[in-house]
Amino acid sequence: MAEELEHQPSLPQQANLTARPPFPIHVLPPKIRAMAEAVAAFMTTGKDLSAAVAMTVLNAAICGGVRIMHRGHPERVTPSGTFNVSIGVSGSGKSVIGGLMMKPIFDFEREAQERFGRDVRPGLEAERIEVEAEIKLLSNEAAKPREEKGADAKARRNRLTDLLRRKHEIEERMHPPQFIIEDSTVQSFARLLKATGGRVLILSTDAREIIANLLGRYNNGKADDSILLKGYSGEGFKFTRKGPNGIVETINVASTAMSMHIMVQPDKATEMAERKELQEGGLLQRINFVWSDNRPGRASLSKPIPPEIREDYQQFIFELMRTYYCAEGEVMFYLSDESWQALEDYKEAAQVAAGDGSHPSWTFHTRDSEIACRLAAGLHAGDLGDKAHESDIPVETIRRAITLMDYYNIDRMMIADNMEDRSDDKVMAKLRDLATTYPDGFSPREAQRKRIAGMHKGAEAVQAILDQKVKNGVLQLVDEGPPRYKFALR
């Protein structure tokens, strides 16, 4: 089949010949790559989108239980979930491609819910009926006049306490298996995390509602990303809110495990990427964005997805979900010594690329090595299936993960550049105001009062901006007296 796909009729060429390079589909594990290529041949809209979703599905299928660690550094344990946003214009096939690639996870959830309804819920219902009947019997006994009650009221109270505890436990166990969430308030999200032991997948082929919620639809317009940040890091979560009846509800989740892949059109991705709270809170820096090259499809070139490729892919993802997502407790993927060193070297290179911290790109690059580590875990599971935990992650897999990370950084750096441009626009506006107010030049102290470095930055940050503007030829120092600045004559 792989040979057949290599000899498909050529697809229509991209209109933009300077477009970013294609997704490095060659680094994907064989069964995953085969399905991504088959979906691309079926849709004829390009391989980027199907390949990007395929990589995400790998991490989603293991994130519930898998953590990554080097034996020599037990203090550094990394979750295996990844956050991803794929962007494509209307008509690029997002819904169909996403539906085909994510189908095994949705099917796994559906089958688990059907088994629960058939094999588990009836027994829980029967147990609840028995408990409620005994509660009613003891409640009726307690309601009798004192002279008609049994002798041992304390024993009855203790028994009622035990029964009510059992009833609460049964009701908690009656929540059907749920792995996927889409449109949700923070409150319902927190309740789901409580019911699932902190594990959840955020998957959607049309994430407008998810982004609306993230940007504050239920939070007075303020972006609400706290639960996602906790889930990405695997941290515990505590949610407290007063309900409409005045009762305070507290939900405690000891730890979280989360992965996300949402698909949107460019306008929603732009709205998300330009939101200041998400930039400053760090969510954007944790996301892999893929602006896909997908183009109009050609029905005459479409090839059906071979059933054996579809079935192999489905069963493989089922295998990963059973073994790793639904694992009891943690399953550790260990990094080999060479893999650990490769990630440390990559981290150092990323820190060098971040420069002196004057450009927002550094807030993205500090995450490069960690995200590559997570990607390597997904690739490792894709290579070895349910035996992945029996072997260390080899350095070759780290190199493949770094190839993916370098691809993701193309779009991540576009976001960082946009953040820098917007920040510089604000600085320049304030400098122009200072130049108008102080035509003979303004001092660093006056620039600090104008807060050219932002609300919470001090004299050192202000001076760094002024020095950079002088270096770039935007400002010049006034010749005489204490330091004062004017716009440079050009």
Language model features by range: what are they?
Residues 1-490:
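Phosphate-handling catalytic cores of nucleic-acid transaction enzymes
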